[in-house]
């Protein structure tokens, strides 16, 4: 008799759990029907882009800090120099099949050239199509920081003039003279 009551109790408990879980709000999101803005959190780190400064020039100065900071080594670039002495990446390549979207490259970039967007649809049929070149990564705008220009903040050497000799430029300060 005890086994019969235990069996009936087990069946009743199972039916109770099925009905309580059956009428709950579902956790599964039907992605194509639901807009991506409802799925992706506000600070989601997705596809990597290269931005331009407010003057329209590339922000990247090919310092290679992003490639060093990348834990999986999916960034490769080659430095070149313009006539005015400014560095730029001759090629900039990101392998998205290896990228873990950690954001370390964005944090390491001193010019805010690398930024992560909330784009997450990077599926391709061929793995080689996930290797993005500079032309695929470079956008026409400044991204998250519209007013920041690296060379306005840091300055750039002028050919034929020493530091402090250019117009509206103060002479460099000897920090050791300030010590007690």
UniProtKB/Swiss-Prot annotation:
Task: Tell me the gene name.
Answer: nuoI
From which domain of life does this come? Bacteria
Residues the record lists as binding [4Fe-4S] cluster 1: 60, 63, 66, 109
Per its Swiss-Prot or TrEMBL entry, what cofactor is needed? [4Fe-4S] cluster
Write down what this protein is called: NADH-quinone oxidoreductase subunit I
Q: What is its EC number?
A: 7.1.1.-
What does the record list as GO biological process?
Answer: aerobic respiration
Q: Main subcellular localization, coarse class?
A: membrane
User: How the protein assembles, per its UniProt entry?
Assistant: NDH-1 is composed of 14 different subunits. Subunits NuoA, H, J, K, L, M, N constitute the membrane sector of the complex.
Name the reaction it catalyses.
a quinone + NADH + 5 H(+)(in) = a quinol + NAD(+) + 4 H(+)(out)
Q: Which organism is it from?
A: Acinetobacter baumannii (strain ATCC 17978 / DSM 105126 / CIP 53.77 / LMG 1025 / NCDC KC755 / 5377)
Q: Give the 4Fe-4S ferredoxin-type domain ranges.
A: 50-80, 90-119
């Amino acid at each position: 008799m005890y086994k019969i009551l235990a069996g009936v109790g087990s069946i009743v408990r199972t039916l109770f759990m099925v009905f309580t879980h059956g009428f709950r709000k579902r956790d599964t999101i039907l992605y194509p029907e639901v807009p991506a803005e409802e799925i992706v959190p506000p600070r989601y780190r997705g596809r990597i882009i290269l931005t331009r400064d407010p003057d329209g020039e590339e922000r990247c100065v090919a310092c290679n800090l992003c490639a060093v900071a990348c834990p999986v080594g999916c960034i490769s670039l080659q430095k070149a120099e313009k006539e005015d002495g400014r560095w730029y990446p001759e090629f900039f390549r990101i392998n998205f099949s290896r990228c873990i979207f950690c954001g370390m490259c964005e944090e390491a970039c001193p010019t805010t050239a690398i930024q992560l967007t909330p784009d997450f649809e990077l599926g391709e049929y061929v793995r080689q199509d996930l290797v993005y070149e500079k032309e695929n990564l470079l956008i026409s705008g400044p991204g998250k920081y519209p007013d920041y220009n690296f060379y306005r903040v840091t300055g750039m050497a002028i050919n034929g003039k020493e530091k402090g000799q250019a117009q509206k430029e103060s002479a460099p300060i000897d920090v050791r003279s300030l010590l007690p």
